């Protein structure tokens, strides 16, 4: 937080009287007001204030914005907007640093000269092209830089033609293919990027996108009900299989493997969602249309539901899992008439160890398992913890933020229960300052250990420093960590000091260029010092460290080989590193297919990066799933010729036609299972076995995270 000075200071602003302008000032911590008179801002701490001046033309349109003293060297950062004869935004100039300006309006010609000098280019604006019609639709965008000016993004418009788009409708039990849209029924927008990769979207007269097309034959359909709600998404491989006119029920293999399904109730709530290859996720809502019950595919096999309770402000109070012993239809009707609202209660009336009522009981529910509990507004819930409450109660610490007396509207505590032992839980208590910034967090873990974090924040919520203590179950300190952050006047992190047990110290130092991008990062006084460079688009082109340099290429060649890219894909890269005896240079050239997917990578060496010993090629299906991979090791010949086999989008088998080579210490794929399928999945799409790696079982918890991995040998 910026220091409060004892006397009022000011920062000069050279405002242009012949222009309309608005000045916005963000003051540092400690300042509560400011006065602007004769072009000067006066306030306590105003020397660290940030001023933004927006100049307007005679029609009230913003034409120039100056962020006063924003850059690392204290220069103003200017950006401009130009308009065409129809009043449309035509050109947006690149942000450009201008020294000694103090918010003054800069003549466009002067701005242009300054920008050219800074960037070393002539096309220093983003230019939008419009069609010559009253619709004023965008037909092109030219990004900054002479190279990108010659390779614009384009857009074209038309209507659909006869037989071009299939017409799907929703039937009583699925999707029905009924024919094709008549000519002129859909608006078509074709967008092409800088590398000629195009995509078309087909929109109906209600403004709904009914189909997108990327390249020939890559069609994705979106199907809506009579209320305009999205009900089905049919990816290309699903559409390819639905070539016959007729009905395709939800149980159809194509829809189960590829389609996205959404079901709604009469209030418009999404009550069912099915992802490709998974069982449906069921959702139930209460009278206030809040989600109160959900059930995924794995829970269905045990008839379990995750249930959520709210307070009167619709804040989540607690969640638990239970078996209601009722059908989804009965539960939906029951919940539709109820409000799942609970409130704080004494321990003898509440769920044990929770502190909330349990008024709305599901019919015949059993096997309750508490999952999470949230507390708000105050800290009266600490009585639940008994003797442990003393460790969780607020304790002030000199030099760190002080807790405010009221926490109204804020989350004050959480309980998270162990999924394997429902009697154990972790509890965390949050304390805030008067601005709502967290200044202290106290946690008791499932193991019984404690963790206390103290923090000090500025008015923007940035953490200036923090101190964390790790204590054992008896409250004895085992490890401490301290962090101190320093920010510049623009709110950018410039330094972080980290210490363990108040002795082992590490520091990170960050520097920024004039546009606010990180330009260097230093660790431990220069032990590691990474520098970054960017091109006109803001893409990283070079990372340089003490013993390592990496260059990334986009629109320019690495040596005299390869194909450049203009849409942001990396066309090549190389890296240089030093050993005790030599300097090693390696690199890769990349190619992409017609759908903008990585198609190959060729290793390159030598001064002109013309040759290499290794390359890999990739092939995909229409959903972007890899189906073939070829690895060639030059002198070592073919390393891998791998084939992927799928059920829907889930890989079930991978084969290597080359087999194990065992030469030159090759890092090759080893296919250990030669007896049928390799991979198996559960109802949520989690992998449950990988026989190629001798993994015969993987078990997941309620969060779909693996908790047990069993190998064939029993380990």
PLM feature spans:
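Beta-strand elements of repeat-based all-beta scaffolds
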Residues: 4-691, 695-700, 705-710, 715
């Amino acid at each position: 937080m910026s220091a409060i000075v004892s006397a009022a200071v000011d920062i000069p602003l050279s405002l242009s009287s012949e222009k309309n302008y608005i000045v916005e000032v963000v003051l540092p911590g400690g300042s509560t007001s400011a006065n602007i008179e004769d072009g000067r801002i006066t306030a306590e701490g105003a020397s660290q204030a940030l001023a933004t001046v927006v100049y307007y033309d005679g029609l009230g349109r913003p034409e120039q914005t100056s962020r006063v003293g924003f850059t690392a060297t204290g220069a103003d950062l200017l950006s401009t907007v130009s308009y065409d004869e129809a009043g449309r935004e035509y050109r947006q100039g690149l942000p450009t640093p201008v020294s000694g300006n103090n918010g003054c309006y800069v003549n466009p010609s002067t701005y242009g000269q300054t920008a050219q000098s800074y960037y070393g280019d002539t096309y220093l604006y983003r230019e939008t092209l419009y069609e010559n019609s009253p619709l004023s639709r965008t037909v092109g965008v030219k990004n900054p830089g002479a190279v990108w000016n010659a390779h614009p993004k384009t857009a074209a418009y038309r209507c659909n033609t006869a037989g071009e788009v299939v017409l799907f409708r929703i039937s009583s039990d699925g999707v029905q293919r009924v024919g094709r849209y008549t000519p002129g029924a859909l608006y078509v927008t074709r967008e092409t990027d800088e590398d000629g990769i195009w995509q078309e979207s087909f929109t109906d007269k209600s403004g709904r996108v009914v189909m997108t097309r990327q390249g020939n034959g890559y069609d994705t359909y979106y199907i809506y009900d009579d209320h305009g709600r999205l009900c089905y998404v049919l990816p290309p491989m699903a559409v390819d299989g639905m070539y016959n006119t007729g009905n395709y029920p939800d149980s159809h293999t194509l829809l189960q493997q590829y389609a996205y399904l959404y079901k709604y109730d009469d209030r418009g709530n999404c009550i069912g969602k099915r992802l490709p290859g998974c069982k449906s996720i069921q959702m139930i809502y209460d009278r206030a249309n809040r989600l109160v019950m959900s059930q995924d595919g794995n829970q269905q096999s045990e008839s379990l539901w995750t249930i959520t309770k709210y307070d009167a402000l619709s804040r989540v109070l607690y969640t638990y899992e239970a078996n209601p012993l009722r059908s989804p239809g009965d539960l939906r009707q029951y919940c539709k008439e109820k409000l799942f609202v609970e409130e704080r209660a004494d321990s003898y009336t509440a769920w044990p160890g929770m502190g909330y009522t349990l008024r709305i009981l599901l019919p015949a529910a059993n096997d309750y398992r508490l999952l999470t509990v949230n507390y708000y507004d105050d800290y009266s819930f600490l009585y639940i913890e008994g003797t442990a409450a003393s460790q969780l109660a607020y304790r002030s610490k000199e030099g760190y933020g002080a807790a405010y007396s009221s926490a109204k509207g804020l989350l004050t505590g959480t309980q998270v229960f162990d999924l394997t032992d429902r009697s154990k839980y972790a509890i965390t208590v949050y304390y805030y300052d008067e601005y709502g910034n967290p200044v202290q967090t106290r946690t008791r873990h499932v193991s019984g250990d404690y963790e206390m974090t103290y923090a000090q924040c500025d008015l923007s919520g940035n953490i200036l420093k923090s101190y964390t203590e790790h204590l054992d179950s008896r409250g004895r300190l085992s490890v401490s960590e301290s962090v101190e952050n320093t920010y510049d006047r623009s709110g950018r992190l410039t330094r972080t000091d980290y210490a363990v047990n108040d002795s082992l110290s590490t520091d990170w130092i960050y520097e920024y260029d004039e546009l606010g991008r990180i330009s260097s990062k230093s660790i431990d006084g220069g032990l590691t010092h990474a520098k970054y460079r960017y091109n006109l688009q803001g893409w990283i082109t070079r990372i340089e460290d003490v013993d390592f340099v990496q260059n990334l290429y986009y629109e320019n060649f690495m040596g005299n080989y390869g194909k450049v890219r203009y849409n942001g894909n990396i066309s090549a890269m190389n890296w240089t590193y030093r050993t005790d005896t030599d300097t090693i240079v390696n690199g890769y050239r990349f190619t992409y297919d017609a759908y903008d997917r990585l198609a190959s990578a060729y290793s390159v060496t030598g001064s002109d990066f013309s040759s290499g010993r290794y390359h890999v090629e990739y092939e995909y299906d229409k959903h972007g799933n890899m189906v073939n991979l070829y690895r060639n090791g030059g002198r070592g010949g073919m390393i891998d010729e791998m084939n992927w086999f799928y059920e829907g989008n889930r890989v079930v088998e991978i084969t290597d036609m080359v087999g194990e080579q065992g030469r030159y210490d090759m890092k090759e794929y080893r296919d250990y299972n030669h007896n049928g399928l390799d991979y198996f999945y559960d109802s949520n799409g989690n992998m449950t076995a990988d026989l190629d790696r001798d993994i015969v079982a993987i078990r997941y918890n309620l969060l779909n995270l693996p908790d047990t991995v069993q190998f064939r040998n029993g380990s």
